[in-house]
Regions:
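Eukaryotic partner-binding/assembly regions in large regulatory complexes
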Residues: 1-27, 140-141
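Short alpha-helical segments that sit at the start of domains
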Residues: 23-72
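Non-catalytic, well-ordered alpha-helical scaffold segments
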Residues: 53-57, 76, 99-102
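Short acidic, hydrophobic short linear motifs in intrinsically disordered regions
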Residues: 69-92
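Short amphipathic alpha-helical interaction segments
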Residues: 91-110
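A short, conserved structural fragment
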Residues: 109-120
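Basic, amphipathic "hinge/linker" alpha-helix immediately C-terminal to the N-terminal HTH DNA-binding motif
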Residues: 120-130
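Short, amphipathic alpha-helical interaction segments positioned at domain boundaries
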Residues: 128-157
Length: 157
């Protein structure tokens, strides 16, 4: 019993407080809107290369379309829009369970791309994604990670 508790403590200390994956791809070119969103998701670690479970791409795309109209969407509305979008593009309807849609929205919220307002969601402050990246991810989230990594580099002699 004592041994398993000791392991649990060790494991909990190994859980990162924050993490981000950044990937560099070729410059954006003549891609469809969905493909641009897909590359963005790959670039910031929301999607893994070769992953066929790409529902997060459609969720972000739907929220970006709603931003143009300054419209907030409930998780049910997001789900409906995602299903419609995937059907139009003749994509498999994998990962469209309500629980998965909410989990993917949470991932977008964790990266400050999406915010919850009452019981609805929107791109943070209906802002441009480039500005969100600079202000929330680059200056705040990424900087806090880099600062902590520097502390570890300074501590290891």
């Amino acid at each position: 019993m004592f041994l398993s508790m000791a392991k649990a403590k060790t494991i909990s200390k190994e859980i990162p407080l924050a993490e981000i994956t950044l990937r560099r791809y070729e410059k954006p070119s003549k891609l469809s809107e969905r493909e641009l969103v897909r590359k963005l998701c790959l670039s910031i670690g929301l999607l893994q290369p070769g992953d066929s479970r790409d529902i997060i791409v459609d969720i972000l795309h739907v929220l970006l379309m709603a931003r143009k109209q300054k419209k907030l969407l409930s998780s049910e509305e997001i789900e409906k829009e995602v299903i419609d979008s995937r059907k139009k593009q003749r994509l498999a309807l994998h990962g469209i369970a309500s629980s998965n849609i909410r989990r993917q929205i949470k991932r977008l919220r964790d990266l400050y791309l999406v915010e919850k307002v009452k019981n609805s969601y929107r791109i943070t402050e209906f802002e441009d994604l480039g500005i969100i990246f600079e202000e929330k991810i680059e200056k705040f989230y990424l900087q806090s990670i880099v600062d902590r990594v520097k502390e570890y580099f300074g501590s290891v002699k």
